[in-house]
C-alpha cells in the first residue's frame, strides 16, 4: 500500500518501468523518475515522498541506497499484489526490496534489504536471500537455501535444497546448483560448475 501519493524512482531504464508498474499496483498516483547526471544532489528541500531504487546492478543499487538513506529519504519496498508471501516469512520493512508479480515466498524465508525478486521467482521455506541480491525471472530456491550478499541468480536458475551460495557470486541462467559454493565465483550449467 502506498504511503505517499507520489514516489521517486531512481532509474529510468526498463527496470524502472516495471518498478513503476508495481508502484501503481500498490496505489501510488504518480512516479517521479530520477536518473544519473553530473552533479546530481538530493536536496533537503525536495518534498519527502517515498523513494525506490530501480537499478538492477547490485553494487550500484547498494551505493545509491546508502547515498539516499544518508539524505533522509524513506526507501520503501515495492511488492506487487499478486505475490504470495507466507505470514511467517520475514521481508525487511522499508528496505528497498522489489517483489514482482507472481513471486512466491514461503514459510520462514527471510528477504534482506535491497533484494530484487523478479517475476515468478520462488523462494521456498526457510531460505535467506542476502542483502542486495537479485533473483531473476523464474529462478527458484528450494527449501533452506542460503544466498549470500550481492549475488545474482540468472533467469530460470535453480538452487537445490539446503545449499548455500557465497557472497558476490553469480549463478548463470538455466544453471542448477547441486553443491555448496562457499567461495565466490561464477557458476554455469547443469550441474552448475565454476567458470
Curated annotation (Swiss-Prot):
Keywords: Acyltransferase, Transferase
Coiled coil segments of this chain: none
Subunit structure: Homotrimer.
Organism encoding this protein: Campylobacter jejuni subsp. jejuni serotype O:2 (strain ATCC 700819 / NCTC 11168)
UniProt family annotation: Belongs to the transferase hexapeptide repeat family.
Protein name: UDP-N-acetylbacillosamine N-acetyltransferase
GO MF annotation: an example: acyltransferase activity, transferring groups other than amino-acyl groups
InterPro entries reported in the protein's UniProt record: AcTrfase_PglD-like, PglD_N, Trans_hexapeptide_repeat, Trimer_LpxA-like_sf
UniProt-annotated binding residues for acetyl-CoA: 134, 155, 173
Amino acid at each position: 500500500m502506498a504511503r505517499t501519493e507520489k514516489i521517486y524512482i531512481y532509474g529510468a531504464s526498463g527496470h524502472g518501468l516495471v518498478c513503476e508498474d508495481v508502484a501503481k499496483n500498490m496505489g501510488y498516483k504518480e512516479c517521479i523518475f530520477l536518473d544519473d547526471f553530473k552533479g546530481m544532489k538530493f536536496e533537503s528541500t525536495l518534498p519527502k515522498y517515498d523513494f525506490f531504487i530501480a537499478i538492477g546492478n547490485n553494487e550500484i543499487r547498494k551505493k545509491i541506497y546508502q547515498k539516499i538513506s544518508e539524505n533522509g529519504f524513506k526507501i520503501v519496498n515495492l511488492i506487487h499484489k499478486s505475490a504470495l508471501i507466507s505470514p511467517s516469512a520475514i521481508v525487511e520493512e522499508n528496505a528497498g526490496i522489489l517483489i514482482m508479480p507472481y513471486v512466491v515466498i514461503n514459510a520462514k524465508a527471510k528477504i534482506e534489504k535491497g533484494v530484487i525478486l523478479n517475476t515468478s521467482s520462488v523462494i521456498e521455506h526457510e531460505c535467506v536471500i542476502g542483502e542486495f541480491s537479485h533473483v531473476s525471472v523464474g529462478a527458484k530456491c528450494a527449501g533452506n537455501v542460503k544466498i549470500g550478499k550481492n549475488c545474482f541468480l540468472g533467469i530460470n536458475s535453480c538452487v537445490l535444497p539446503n545449499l548455500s551460495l557465497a557472497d558476490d557470486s553469480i549463478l548463470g541462467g538455466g544453471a542448477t546448483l547441486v553443491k555448496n559454493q562457499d567461495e565466490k565465483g561464477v557458476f554455469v550449467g547443469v550441474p552448475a560448475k565454476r567458470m
